[in-house]
């Protein structure tokens, strides 16, 4: 039955900002859905508040709204655009919740909009735990013993039945937010209190513990004629008790017998039938008790998910695209499989002749005080995927693709340490981010497979694989490089050993292993991901490396090629913005007739989609892997400036190996990043910088600090996302920093800068082609200098800076671009204090602001710069004028503090945000208000505000207090702030700080007295003292600001209505022309 003709236009709901548990896999699914539906001739309307996505590019949909995904805003869009249908299965939990809310509020009925892809009833049946349990019983499947609670009393009654340990999960939240495992009553009450607070329906599901059981997932697609296929089976390497998003996973499932697999396959199809999913993809999760084989259904998601992105990349089967077409009435047998060039229909189940491993990437080092043990609440921020012919090869490739400094199973503990065994046992039993390496250490320390199994519950089959690799490592260390004869080296490479790891084991340099491979002519071949285990010929070049005989790469010899190196796994400081740039580079160069080659290993992204580039190599972005691809493809140029720090780190080594790095030269990049060389350039150009020094010892630092003056910003050289960067206020602070943080720099020096307190920070993105410098955009930060630029909200155009100051910056950017010989993108950061412009830093590469600026101005910077790198001047492209839009765009960040209880949510020079949203308005206030709504802030228009500010802010706080009064707020203040306000004739209610007696601030926050808090501090002591204010505000969902500038922006936004007017990107850009 072909597509529906009763609908003409479809509204797709996006997933909003990137948060832990919902990352860029939804940009991938949303972008695919837009393409698939427009291909069928539908008018597509898209709403997504995240500007760093490909799906919000103006050419992806007919009308694109970068607006908050909030039912009232979406109602405005529906009223204006009048879609016939809404597709909510592409935007994760955010989109599902929004669709259900639109249904509940009667919006869909009011405007006659049909929900496609999933019915409200099916979503509710899958998400509502009680209905789900009843449905499973009906088809003869077991679920965990459980109960549902809406209050603490009910929860305790359920716990009495289920017993401890038990697992608590709030309904309608994602990434396991607010859930956890309770081993006793005290922990139980704490988790339930948090869960009741986070669940939009105030509902908790309390389950018997299945900890230690094996966990499996099935990716299923079903159409309305009841054709059902399993796209992929996924097995969790880690047992139940660790959220599947934080588990290492393997596809296809490795330890099921055929009979067990068939039982699970049939069960998952039965689940989709019963829940009523008949137009799209779902994932069904199972737990199996390894002792007796008891099978339990854990849950099902009636939408495209993180696992379906993984399954799509693992098999080459585009689940989101197929799901979008099924949603408009097609059946599986009517759709053709792209990868085989239409030789097979989409109703053929993919079969694969390789093994895929996914490993999550964590960022605990950014959250001092966070609990870094893995539980049922998801904490990872990204993931890496690797493909190999065996489990061992795929696992070792994934370990090196993770970019955490490991080249394979590098040891974590020294076996000479008397505490070694205790530490290993602790890490195995209570898993953290590095357990996989401790397993290898356990085998080195003499534990048996059973010994490790008893501590971890990881299937013995996986453990045997790791043990074998450890024994091989011992052999390499024993025989050294002379013992690496051709056959032995081939065996090692087949098992996924990296040159760098072998070099470390044999005690030689990596280059020597490479030389040895050249002597033996030992190189990888490339195999294709083709959905059919090489049964049919394939047109798409989607490749992975392995050490076998036959190479299927078949590179072209008649076309000019350009290779783009991606950014690897997402992490804080290097996220979707960089992937966005890589995709744009590929699209632009394809349009210009080049053959484009993408190298990346992140399964969540659009860059690793098989039709983004002409050729895709799903490989770790390391020197060894990239050089092997260059050897076979021989590209005319390689782009390293777009994937963040990952490919940049390789620039020099690639150049040294004779690889043509295009754009800004590695030497110019080094001139900008190396402190001393940069200093010389700045002095030549006579630009101002904050007083600074480079030091290599504690004593030297103490001396220099006296000359520069406190406060100081201290950091190691060469970092992204401000790792190990801090503001120190006195000598004791400085000494503590050197003792605790400086080990990051591996004998590299530490930089000291005088900290410009209260300066306004500004970001400028520009493109230089050697002749002309194009200013992409000047963004004024809302938080003052000292907050990492990636964590600060910003406005384009600037909202307080004078024209003169902006012109000074334009001139300085131009001088720097020419001095550093930039070819392509560059980003410059300035600080403005007392009308003086200070240069903070220059990055001759794509910055994380590029997507935001492109959306705000309508100039696709990443595309323009990619063409510049390939030799096309700005004049030839007709892009030489800076665009200053007639409206305001505000970028606001999203922070993951709710996942890390115990971490102080104070913003500082270390970047901690995971994602961003954008708000657009006729005024700064309207744009800022929209950005706040988009980032799920809890800003209220009136109520009671608490003011508690540091010495340096006391003059300006009077003005803020007056604005809040005018808005109708009642005011409270702490002692020092109250005195200043009193002198100005404003009399707030006085409140006690925590150590001044009760009722104090924290009591009042807990009692729900405040709707807004502003709390600014400086100095380590004051920061520690006021931490409980910030933590309580976060916990009780009170909107708070930790900078005075943020407070003023909030006060302005209170007058604006964020839900009143919606504007599409296409309408915005039309205003510019």
From Swiss-Prot:
Residues binding Mg(2+) 3: 829, 841
List of residues binding Mn(2+) 3: 829, 841
Sites where the protein binds Mn(2+) 2: 299, 301
Binding residue positions for ATP 2: 715, 754, 756, 761, 786-789, 829, 841
UniProt-listed InterPro entries: ATP-grasp, CarbamoylP_synth_lsu, CarbamoylP_synth_lsu_oligo, CarbamoylP_synth_lsu_oligo_sf, CbamoylP_synth_lsu-like_ATP-bd, CbamoylP_synth_lsu_CPSase_dom, MGS-like_dom, MGS-like_dom_sf
Residues annotated to bind Mn(2+) 4: 841, 843
Cofactor: Mg(2+); Mn(2+)
Pathway where this protein functions: Amino-acid biosynthesis; L-arginine biosynthesis; carbamoyl phosphate from bicarbonate: step 1/1; Pyrimidine metabolism; UMP biosynthesis via de novo pathway; (S)-dihydroorotate from bicarbonate: step 1/3
Catalytic activity reported: hydrogencarbonate + L-glutamine + 2 ATP + H2O = carbamoyl phosphate + L-glutamate + 2 ADP + phosphate + 2 H(+)
Quaternary structure, from the entry: Composed of two chains; the small (or glutamine) chain promotes the hydrolysis of glutamine to ammonia, which is used by the large (or ammonia) chain to synthesize carbamoyl phosphate. Tetramer of heterodimers (alpha,beta)4.
NCBIfam families listed in its UniProt record: CPSaseII_lrg, PRK05294.1, PRK12815.1
Protein name per UniProt: Carbamoyl phosphate synthase large chain
